Swiss-Prot record:
Its EC number is 2.7.10.1. Changing residue 248 to G: In a renal clear cell carcinoma sample; somatic mutation. It is an enzyme of class 2 (transferase). The keyword Transmembrane helix applies. Disulfide bonds join 53-103, 150-200, 246-307, 445-530, 571-642, 688-737, 1024-1045. It comes from Homo sapiens. Residues 46-110, 141-207, 224-320, 328-414, 421-548, 551-660, 667-753 form the Ig-like C2-type domain. This is Vascular endothelial growth factor receptor 2. Changing residue 1059 to F: Strongly reduced autophosphorylation. Abolishes phosphorylation of downstream signaling proteins. The active site is at residue 1028. Tyrosine-protein kinase that acts as a cell-surface receptor for VEGFA, VEGFC and VEGFD. Plays an essential role in the regulation of angiogenesis, vascular development, vascular permeability, and embryonic hematopoiesis. Promotes proliferation, survival, migration and differentiation of endothelial cells. Promotes reorganization of the actin cytoskeleton. Isoforms lacking a transmembrane domain, such as isoform 2 and isoform 3, may function as decoy receptors for VEGFA, VEGFC and/or VEGFD. The gene is KDR. Residues 1-19 form the signal peptide. Glycans are attached at residues 46, 66, 96, 143, 158, 245, 318, 374, 395, 511, 523, 580, 613, 619, 631, 675, 704, 721.
C-alpha cells in the first residue's frame, strides 16, 4: 500500500515538472500560503522577521532591493515538515528592510505578497538602490505629475516636500499633492520645475528627518514637425542611389528616437545614420537628423517611406512615395489637349502633360518657328500667353527629349482665339446727332467678330422714356441706362423703319458684318440700339436719334377767332437746337403772299420792330413762347413772326403766321322745313343747316319739348340731321329746329303726319329675334374664349410650397416667410387714413378690429374693413407671425371666395396692422344655427317667403349667370390695394339685403359648399394647405358669398372648445384626417377630409360633428378602422355620398377639389333647372328613416328605391344627371358601400348637468357658452318648423349648438371672456322637447332613437 502512494506522488511530480518545463499552466493551483495571514505587517527594528510559505510546487522568495545589505542577512531555508515549503528569515531588521515580500511559484504569476514596515524612528525614510542617482526628471506639462521616491518605514508619517532654490515647502492637500509610504511624494511637475533640488522631510517628536536630495531635471517632449527631403515626386531608375533625410525640430532638452518604415526594410545595402544638428546659440529649438541611404535600388524598393520621430510623450510622422522605373523613358500624358479655345485678352495656359524619367527637355514651336520667352510668352513646362490676341492663333508644337536616352516625343496643339462683337462706329467720338423732321435717314452698324455674329438685332425706345435720373448710374460706356427696349419690328408710336439684310465686307483688311437701318420718316426723337451676339460675347451701340424742326406757330384754340374771343399764339422750338425765342408783328396789313418762313434778310432786320410780350414755358424737349390776345378785335389781325436762334451756328430762323379775326354774325338757318306725311314703319330724314359767327348750336323740339336721341331717333352731324326710324303714331307732331348763339336764335318748324294702323311685320320680328340670337351666340363664344385664355394663363404660374401650412419636405414656414417679399410701395396704407372702430374679436396675442379705410380702393372713398393687429406687449415672435401671415396673403393673391388682403401698415411709428375684407355676417357656423327655424328645403314659384305662414322659397335671380361668374373667378396677381371685385358683377340685379331676414333653402347649402370648394381649389393651385378647414373659418359676406379665412394668426386654441388636448398640443381632431391624427401629415388630401366634415356641418345647419361621441383614443381608433358619421339631417343622398368620398381612408382615393367643384357645380346647376319643373324636396310629412344595414340617415320615400349607386326617388331628381354620372366615373370614387359603420346615437338617460373645467374642455371636445345656453333654452319653446326635417336631438350634441360662438374671424376674432358655463347634455334637451310636447298636447310621436325613426310633429 505504501508503494502505491509513493508511485502516485512520483507520477504527480512528473506531470507538474513537465508542465513547468514547457511553461504550461498548472492544473488548478492555489496561491502560496504565508504563515502570517496579513497584507501589512509592522514590526520594530532589531527584531527578527520570519515568514514561512507553503504551496503545491517549487517556490521562490523576492524581497525589497533597498540599501540595507539584506542580500547577506536574508536566509531562505526549506521546511522540514513539507515538500513545497520555504522559510524567509532576516535577523535584526532595520528600516531599510521595509518593503514588499513576495512568495511565488516558479515560472508563473501566482504569488502571495505581504508588505512589512520596519519602524525605525531614527531613519524613517528608506534609501532604495535607485536613489543612488538622486535625479528626478520632470516636464512642464500642467497635466503631468511627478513622484519623488522618498518611501517611508513608518506608514503614518507627516511628510512635506522641500524645494531649493528658492526654498519652498509643499504640504499634502489631499488632492493633487500627496505622500504615500509605499510610493513616495506626488506633486504636479510644473510646481517644482523652477527648483534645483528637492527632498522629503518628516517630523517625529519635534525632530526633523530628511530623505536624500533629488536633483530636478526639466526635460522637453514637444516635436514641432518632421520633414522629409526630398518631400515628393521622388523617381529613380533601377540601380540608382536613394537618399532620404528626415529632420525633426523639437524644443530643448528633448531626446528623439527615429523609426523608418519602407518596403524593403531588410535591404542589404541600406544604411541609417542618426545625429544631432548644431543649433545657433539662443535658439529655442533643436534639430535631429536621420538619413536613410539605399545603394542600387530595385523595383522592390518602390513604395511608401515613412519616418517617425518619438520623444516618449509625443510622436510625429511624415511620408513620401518613391517610384522606381525599370529604365529612362518619356511619353505624353492622356490629358494632353489638341484644341484650345480662348477669347481675346484672356490668359492662356497650355501645359505639356508628360510621363517620363528623368524629366525631359521641353521645346515649344509656333507654326514651325521656335518660341522664346518674353514679357508676353512664358515657354516652359507650361506655355503661358499673358493677353492672347488674334495674332496668337496658330499651331503650337511641343517636343519632349529624354536627357539620358535622347528619346523624343512631339504633340501639336491648335490655338483658336475668338473675338467678341466689336462695333466700329462705337469708337468714333460724335455728339448727339440731330436729324431734320420728316427726312429719311440711314443708321449703320459695322461689326467685327470671330466667329461672325449669329445675328444683329435692332431695338428702339422713345427718347423721353430713357431720360437720366439722379439715382441711375451712368457710365461712359453706357450713357443711356434704358431698360425697356422694343424691337424695331414693333415701331408703334415711333418712326417707320425698314431693316436691310446683313452684308459682309472686307474693311481695313478684316471681314466685317454691316447692318443698316432705314428710317423712312424722322418724326419722333428716339434711341436706337444695335446688338450683335456670337458664341463668346455680345456688343452693342446706342445711337441717339434726335429729331428737330424749325420753330412752329400754332393757334390755341386751333380755329380762326371771332371778335371778343381770346386766342393764343404758340411758338414751339426744339430746346436743344434753338434759343432766344421772340415774338414780332409785321404790320396790320397781311403779306401779299402766304409764306411759312421769312427770307433771311427780312429776318435779320426784325430788331427794328417792337417786341411783343409773351410767356415762356419749357418741357423736356421744347421751349414754348406763348403770346395771348384777350378779347381779340379786328385791329389784332396781321402777320405775326416768331424768331429763334440756332444754338450752334447762331443763325436766325423766322416763321410767320397770319392771324384773321372774324366779325360776329347772328345765327341764320338756310332753307325751311317742309311738312311731311309718312306711313307707320317708314323712316323720316330731315336736315337743318345754320350759319353764324360764332357757330350756333342746333337743337330739335317736338311739340315744344326737347327731342333727345332714343332707340328710333338719331341725331347726327352736330344735330343738323334728324332721322326717325320705323315711325309710330306717337311720332306725329310739330318739329322745330332752333339754332342759337350769344347773338340770338333762329328757328324753322314743320308738322309730321303719321298714317296707317300700329302693327309689326313678321319680317321685323324675325330680324329682331335673329339679331338677338346671333348676338347671344357671339357673346357666349367670347366668354368661352376668355375663360380658356384665363385658365391657360393661370396654369403657368409657378409657386413654391409655402402658405398657411408648408409641405413637411420643404423648408420650415418661418424660413420660407423670411424669403417672401413685401413691396411697401404696393401694399403700404397710411395709418392716418384708417379709423378704428369696435373690436370684432381677440385671440391669444392678436385682435381684430372693425375699421373705416379712406381711399383704400378706387370704387369708394370710404370702405369698412377688418384690421388684424397685435395686443400690447406682443413678443418679437408674435410680430413675426403676423408679418408672416401678411406675406402669405400677398403670395396667395386675390380670389372671390378667400378673405382677401387690402393693405397693411408696417412702417415704424405705430402698430403692425394687416387690412383684410370685412364680412358683416360673421362665420358660417353661427349663421346656419341662427337659420334653423327659417330653413325650407324645397322651392316653389313664389316670389318671396311668407314668414309665419308658408315656408316656400324662390330661386335666386339669375342663378346660372351667378354660377358662371363664380366659377370663372380666377386668381389675380394682386399688387397694391386690391380693388375689390364688385359683387354687382356677379349679381347685377340682386339688391343688397339682410341675409338674416331671408329664409334658407337647400340651394343655399349647395351654393355655400360649391363656393368653399372653389376657394379651396384656388388655394390648392397656389400650393397651399389650410389645415383647419371648418365652418367656423368660413365667413359670410353680402349676397350669399362665402369666403375662406384663418391663415394662421393667433387662434386662442387654449380657450377654443373645438381643439382637443393631445399631449401638450390642442388639435381640432373632429376635422382632422386619420393620417393627420396618427402621422402628423398635412396634405391637400387631408384638407379634402376636412371639407367633408365641413359639408356635414353645412347640411346639419351648424351642428357640431360627431354628436355625442367622446373624443378620445377610442374615437381615433374607430375612425381609423372606418367608422364614419351618419348622414346629417338636411342632406341628400348625393351630398352624403360626397361626404363619404371625402372621408375615404386612403388619401389618394379622395376626390380633388377640382372634381368637387365640378360635381357641386353640376348639383347646383341641376337645382337651378328645377324652376318650374322638378324641385329638390326633402320629405315633410314622413319621418326620416334609418337603414339598418348602413347606418345612414337619408331623406327618402317609405319604399326605398336605392339600387347600388343610383337614387331613383323623384323627390331627389336632378336634370343634370349626366354631369353627375360623369363625375362619378372620372373621379376616384368607388361604389357605394353596402354597409357603413357609423358612430351610434347618444342613449336616452337622465339629464346631467356638468360644470365646465377651467380649460373649457369636455370629453367631447365641445363646450356650451352661457349666451348660447340661453339660446338653446329659448329654442325648446318653439315647435318644429316642419315634421320631416326636425333634427333628431338624439343625434346632435346640444353642446355643439353653441360651440365656438365668435364673430367669425377665427384668426384672432376670439373672445377672451371665458366665464364658467353649464353644460347641458343631449338627453336633457331631448327630455325638454318631450316635456314640452306633452304639456302642449301635441300629437308628437315619442319614438325610441335606436329604432331608426326620429321625433316628428305635424307641419305648421
Amino acid at each position: 500500500m505504501q508503494s502505491k502512494v509513493l508511485l502516485a506522488v512520483a507520477l504527480w511530480l512528473c506531470v507538474e515538472t513537465r508542465a513547468a518545463s514547457v511553461g504550461l499552466p498548472s492544473v488548478s493551483l492555489d496561491l502560496p500560503r504565508l504563515s502570517i495571514q496579513k497584507d501589512i505587517l509592522t514590526i520594530k527594528a532589531n527584531t527578527t522577521l520570519q515568514i514561512t510559505c507553503r504551496g503545491q510546487r517549487d517556490l521562490d522568495w523576492l524581497w525589497p532591493n533597498n540599501q540595507s545589505g539584506s542580500e547577506q542577512r536574508v536566509e531562505v531555508t526549506e521546511c522540514s515538515d513539507g515538500l513545497f515549503c520555504k522559510t524567509l528569515t532576516i535577523p535584526k531588521v532595520i528600516g531599510n528592510d521595509t518593503g514588499a515580500y513576495k512568495c511565488f511559484y516558479r515560472e508563473t504569476d501566482l504569488a502571495s505578497v505581504i508588505y512589512v514596515y520596519v519602524q525605525d524612528y531614527r531613519s524613517p525614510f528608506i534609501a532604495s538602490v535607485s536613489d543612488q542617482h538622486g535625479v528626478v526628471y520632470i516636464t512642464e506639462n500642467k497635466n503631468k505629475t511627478v513622484v519623488i521616491p522618498c518611501l517611508g518605514s513608518i506608514s503614518n508619517l507627516n511628510v512635506s516636500l522641500c524645494a531649493r532654490y528658492p526654498e519652498k515647502r509643499f504640504v499634502p492637500d489631499g488632492n493633487r499633492i500627496s505622500w504615500d509610504s509605499k510610493k513616495g511624494f506626488t506633486i504636479p511637475s510644473y510646481m517644482i520645475s523652477y527648483a534645483g533640488m528637492v527632498f522629503c522631510e518628516a517630523k517625529i517628536n519635534d525632530e526633523s528627518y530628511q530623505s536624500i536630495m533629488y536633483i530636478v531635471v526639466v526635460v522637453g517632449y514637444r516635436i514641432y514637425d518632421v520633414v522629409l527631403s526630398p518631400s515628393h515626386g521622388i523617381e529613380l531608375s533601377v540601380g540608382e542611389k536613394l537618399v532620404l533625410n528626415c529632420t525633426a525640430r523639437t524644443e530643448l532638452n528633448v531626446g528623439i528616437d527615429f523609426n523608418w518604415e519602407y518596403p524593403s526594410s531588410k535591404h542589404q545595402h541600406k544604411k541609417l545614420v542618426n545625429r544631432d544638428l548644431k543649433t545657433q546659440s539662443g535658439s529655442e529649438m533643436k534639430k535631429f537628423l536621420s538619413t536613410l541611404t539605399i545603394d542600387g535600388v530595385t523595383r522592390s524598393d518602390q513604395g511608401l517611406y515613412t519616418c517617425a520621430a518619438s520623444s516618449g510623450l509625443m510622436t510625429k510622422k511624415n511620408s513620401t512615395f518613391v517610384r522606381v522605373h525599370e529604365k529612362p523613358f518619356v511619353a505624353f500624358g492622356s490629358g494632353m489637349e489638341s484644341l484650345v479655345e480662348a477669347t481675346v485678352g484672356e490668359r492662356v495656359r497650355i501645359p505639356a502633360k508628360y510621363l517620363g524619367y528623368p524629366p525631359p527637355e521641353i521645346k515649344w514651336y509656333k507654326n514651325g518657328i521656335p518660341l522664346e520667352s518674353n514679357h508676353t510668352i512664358k515657354a516652359g513646362h507650361v506655355l503661358t500667353i499673358m493677353e492672347v490676341s488674334e495674332r496668337d492663333t496658330g499651331n503650337y508644337t511641343v517636343i519632349l527629349t529624354n536627357p539620358i536616352s535622347k528619346e523624343k516625343q512631339s504633340h501639336v496643339v491648335s490655338l483658336v482665339v475668338y473675338v467678341p462683337p466689336q462695333i466700329g462706329e462705337k469708337s468714333l467720338i460724335s455728339p448727339v446727332d440731330s436729324y431734320q423732321y420728316g427726312t429719311t435717314q440711314t443708321l449703320t452698324c459695322t461689326v467685327y467678330a470671330i466667329p461672325p455674329p449669329h445675328h444683329i438685332h435692332w431695338y428702339w425706345q422713345l427718347e423721353e422714356e430713357c431720360a437720366n435720373e439722379p439715382s441711375q448710374a451712368v457710365s461712359v460706356t453706357n450713357p443711356y441706362p434704358c431698360e425697356e427696349w422694343r424691337s424695331v419690328e414693333d415701331f408703334q408710336g415711333g418712326n417707320k423703319i425698314e431693316v436691310n439684310k446683313n452684308q459682309f465686307a472686307l474693311i481695313e483688311g478684316k471681314n466685317k458684318t454691316v447692318s443698316t437701318l432705314v428710317i423712312q420718316a424722322a418724326n419722333v426723337s428716339a434711341l436706337y440700339k444695335c446688338e450683335a451676339v456670337n458664341k463668346v460675347g455680345r456688343g452693342e451701340r446706342v445711337i441717339s436719334f434726335h429729331v428737330t424742326r424749325g420753330p412752329e406757330i400754332t393757334l390755341q384754340p386751333d380755329m380762326q377767332p371771332t371778335e371778343q374771343e381770346s386766342v393764343s399764339l404758340w411758338c414751339t422750338a426744339d430746346r436743344s437746337t434753338f434759343e432766344n425765342l421772340t415774338w414780332y408783328k409785321l404790320g396790320p396789313q397781311p403779306l401779299p403772299i402766304h409764306v411759312g418762313e421769312l427770307p433771311t434778310p427780312v429776318c435779320k432786320n426784325l430788331d427794328t420792330l417792337w417786341k411783343l410780350n409773351a410767356t415762356m414755358f419749357s418741357n423736356s424737349t421744347n421751349d414754348i413762347l406763348i403770346m395771348e390776345l384777350k378779347n381779340a378785335s379786328l385791329q389784332d389781325q396781321g402777320d405775326y413772326v416768331c424768331l429763334a436762334q440756332d444754338r450752334k451756328t447762331k443763325k436766325r430762323h423766322c416763321v410767320v403766321r397770319q392771324l384773321t379775326v372774324l366779325e360776329r354774325v347772328a345765327p341764320t338757318i338756310t332753307g325751311n322745313l317742309e311738312n311731311q306725311t309718312t306711313s307707320i314703319g317708314e323712316s323720316i330724314e330731315v336736315s337743318c343747316t345754320a350759319s353764324g359767327n360764332p357757330p350756333p348750336q342746333i337743337m330739335w323740339f317736338k311739340d315744344n319739348e326737347t327731342l333727345v336721341e332714343d332707340s328710333g331717333i338719331v341725331l347726327k352731324d352736330g344735330n343738323r340731321n334728324l332721322t326717325i326710324r320705323r315711325v309710330r303714331k306717337e311720332d306725329e307732331g310739330l318739329y322745330t329746329c332752333q339754332a342759337c348763339s350769344v347773338l340770338g336764335c333762329a328757328k324753322v318748324e314743320a308738322f309730321f303726319i303719321i298714317e296707317g294702323a300700329q302693327e309689326k311685320t313678321n319680317l321685323e320680328i324675325i330680324i329682331l329675334v335673329g339679331t338677338a340670337v346671333i348676338a347671344m351666340f357671339f357673346w357666349l363664344l367670347l366668354v368661352i374664349i376668355l375663360r380658356t385664355v384665363k385658365r391657360a394663363n393661370g396654369g403657368e404660374l409657378k409657386t413654391g410650397y409655402l402658405s398657411i401650412v408648408m409641405d413637411p419636405d420643404e423648408l420650415p414656414l418661418d424660413e420660407h416667410c423670411e424669403r417672401l417679399p413685401y413691396d411697401a410701395s404696393k401694399w403700404e396704407f397710411p395709418r392716418d387714413r384708417l379709423k378704428l372702430g369696435k373690436p370684432l374679436g381677440r385671440g391669444a396675442f392678436g385682435q381684430v378690429i372693425e375699421a373705416d379705410a379712406f381711399g383704400i380702393d378706387k370704387t369708394a372713398t370710404c370702405r369698412t374693413v377688418a384690421v388684424k393687429m397685435l395686443k400690447e406687449g406682443a413678443t418679437h415672435s408674435e410680430h413675426r407671425a403676423l408679418m408672416s401671415e401678411l406675406k402669405i396673403l400677398i403670395h396667395i393673391g386675390h380670389h372671390l371666395n378667400v378673405v382677401n388682403l387690402l393693405g397693411a401698415c408696417t412702417k415704424p411709428g405705430g402698430p403692425l396692422m394687416v387690412i383684410v375684407e370685412f364680412c358683416k355676417f360673421g362665420n358660417l357656423s353661427t349663421y346656419l344655427r341662427s337659420k334653423r327655424n327659417e330653413f325650407v328645403p324645397y322651392k316653389t314659384k313664389g316670389a318671396r317667403f311668407r314668414q309665419g305662414k308658408d315656408y316656400v322659397g324662390a330661386i335666386p335671380v339669375d342663378l346660372k349667370r351667378r354660377l358662371d361668374s363664380i366659377t370663372s373667378s380666377q386668381s389675380s396677381a394682386s399688387s397694391g390695394f386690391v380693388e375689390e371685385k364688385s359683387l354687382s358683377d356677379v349679381e347685377e340685379e340682386e339688391a343688397p339685403e339682410d341675409l338674416y331676414k331671408d329664409f334658407l333653402t337647400l340651394e343655399h347649402l349647395i351654393c355655400y359648399s360649391f363656393q368653399v370648394a372653389k376657394g379651396m381649389e384656388f388655394l390648392a393651385s397656389r400650393k397651399c394647405i389650410h389645415r383647419d378647414l371648418a365652418a367656423r373659418n368660413i365667413l359670410l359676406s353680402e349676397k350669399n358669398v362665402v369666403k375662406i379665412c384663418d391663415f394662421g394668426l393667433a387662434r386662442d386654441i387654449y380657450k377654443d372648445p373645438d381643439y382637443v388636448r393631445k399631449g401638450d398640443a390642442r388639435l381640432p381632431l373632429k376635422w382632422m384626417a386619420p393620417e393627420t391624427i396618427f402621422d402628423r401629415v398635412y396634405t391637400i388630401q387631408s384638407d379634402v377630409w376636412s371639407f367633408g366634415v365641413l359639408l356635414w356641418e353645412i347640411f346639419s345647419l351648424g351642428a357640431s360633428p360627431y354628436p355625442g361621441v367622446k373624443i378620445d383614443e377610442e374615437f381615433c381608433r374607430r375612425l381609423k378602422e372606418g367608422t364614419r358619421m351618419r348622414a346629417p339631417d338636411y342632406t341628400t343622398p348625393e351630398m352624403y355620398q360626397t361626404m363619404l368620398d371625402c372621408w375615404h381612408g386612403e388619401p389618394s382615393q379622395r376626390p380633388t377639389f377640382s372634381e368637387l367643384v365640378e360635381h357641386l357645380g353640376n348639383l347646383l346647376q341641376a337645382n337651378a333647372q328645377q324652376d318650374g319643373k322638378d324641385y329638390i324636396v326633402l320629405p315633410i310629412s314622413e319621418t326620416l328613416s334609418m337603414e339598418e344595414d348602413s347606418g345612414l340617415s337619408l331623406p327618402t320615400s317609405p319604399v326605398s328605391c336605392m339600387e347600388e349607386e343610383e337614387v331613383c326617388d323623384p323627390k331627389f331628381h336632378y336634370d343634370n344627371t349626366a354631369g353627375i354620372s360623369q363625375y362619378l366615373q372620372n373621379s376616384k370614387r368607388k361604389s357605394r358601400p353596402v354597409s357603413v359603420k357609423t358612430f351610434e346615437d347618444i342613449p336616452l338617460e337622465e339629464p346631467e348637468v356638468k360644470v365646465i373645467p377651467d380649460d373649457n374642455q369636455t370629453d367631447s371636445g365641445m363646450v356650451l357658452a352661457s349666451e348660447e345656453l340661453k339660446t338653446l333654452e329659448d329654442r325648446t319653446k318653439l315647435s318644429p318648423s316642419f315634421g320631416g326635417m326636425v333634427p333628431s336631438k338624439s343625434r346632435e350634441s346640444v353642446a355643439s349648438e353653441g360651440s365656438n360662438q365668435t364673430s367669425g374671424y377665427q384668426s384672432g376674432y376670439h373672445s377672451d371672456d371665458t366665464d364658467t358655463t353649464v353644460y347641458s347634455s343631449e338627453e336633457a334637451e331631448l327630455l325638454k322637447l318631450i316635456e314640452i310636447g306633452v304639456q302642449t298636447g301635441s300629437t308628437a310621436q315619442i319614438l325610441q332613437p335606436d329604432s331608426g325613426t326620429t321625433l316628428s310633429s305635424p307641419p305648421v
